[in-house]
Amino acid sequence: NISLSGEIDIYNAPELKSKLLGLLEQKKGDIRIDCKDLKYIDSTGLGVLISALRHVKDYDGNITIRNLKPYIQKIFRITGLDKVFIIEAQG
């Protein structure tokens, strides 16, 4: 499991990528990402998530994204990523 906070953009997306790669190397089950403190994500950050999902799918896993703020959830909806990732409502 991983929690995202603040902003994920071109400047800090590599840090997110390395965290996710660490989880992916374990090749165990699904990855859950809590976004309750995430305030912003750009296309670079979305690209990192998509790349991670491709790796997870290689071993029949999935990525669940939880607690997206409404305006970030809208980005996932507009880009169609809400159909690719498992999105859980805030709660």
For each feature predicted by the language model, list its residue ranges.
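Short, glycine-rich nucleotide/cofactor-binding loops
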Residues: 42
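STAS-like cytosolic regulatory interaction modules
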Residues: 1-39, 51-91
